[in-house]
Amino acid sequence: MKVILKGGLGNQLFQLGLGVLLSRKLNCELEIDVSLLNPLVRGQYNRDVGVFNFALPGVSYSISNDYSSLNLFSRLKRFILNRFYNHFHGFIPSVNSGAGFNILDGYFQSYRYYIDDIAYIKSLFTLRDVHRVEKVSLLEKEIQNSLSYVIHVRRGDYAEDASVASSHLICFPSYYQRLIDSIESEKSDVTWFVFSDDTSWVRNNLSFSSNVVFVSELFLGYPAAPAIEIHLMSFGYAHVISNSTFSWWGAFLKRSDGPVYTP
């Protein structure tokens, strides 16, 4: 089973999670193609292969870099052999059987692919020990030992790239501020743990009355920062997420039964 990774870390987790489940179900080798994470591939952003910063215990896989040849074959399949190539949006129940195909090329952004394997998926995406440096361990304890509200603010290409913004709606400041005000009015001992690709914007546009820790600022320049941040987000009691797969995974992997607030 080949899975073609594309997009940022949140998207990669959806793709790899499904690939692992299907290769396990079919008892076959898993091949992970990373070609589309290469900035030289036309139409693609430069993305890190962040999924390999997670432990993936018990998963056997090989890595390939040959999507350029697959691209031509894909076009032929779409226009000439359409019955072998299906293009869908949303959840595709038949994918869960793994029958009739051996390439996963898409985003597969639905937890319903994992509905019977949630505990297993969570066990896959634990941070590799090599990244659990002292700073990470201390933050784990701080987040676990407080009434921690994780808030993730996604901006980046959503705010800066018009082509991305046209298809990915950015959350308004009022969405975050209403939740911050409501939660702080009900709970006096909240500590906010802020994760964002634009913490300057958060500082200038959102107001907190409670304690605040800007976690993302502590890992600037870390190659594994995205994986570390999702890992730390999972320790939060409650989550305020944005319109982002990165946000979604931080909340999905959480260890508590606290609430998740969504746009």
What residue spans do the PLM features occupy?
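A structural signal for isolated positions on well-ordered beta-strands in alpha/beta enzyme cores
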Residues: K2, E31, V150, T191-F193
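A short beta-strand-loop structural module common to alpha/beta enzyme folds
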Residues: C28-L40
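A short, glycine/small-residue-rich beta-strand->loop->alpha-helix junction that serves as a flexible
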Residues: L5-F14, V41
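Secretory-pathway luminal glycosyltransferase catalytic domains
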Residues: R42-S188
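Histidine-anchored nucleotide/phosphate-binding helix
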Residues: F14-R24, Y176-I183
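Donor-binding and catalytic core of enzymes assembling or modifying cell-surface/extracellular glycoconjugates
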Residues: L9, D181, S185-P263
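Short, well-ordered beta-to-alpha junction loops that form the rim of enzyme active sites
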Residues: V34-L36, V153-R154, F195-D198
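Nucleotide-activated donor-dependent transferases that construct or modify glycoconjugates
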Residues: M1-G8, S35
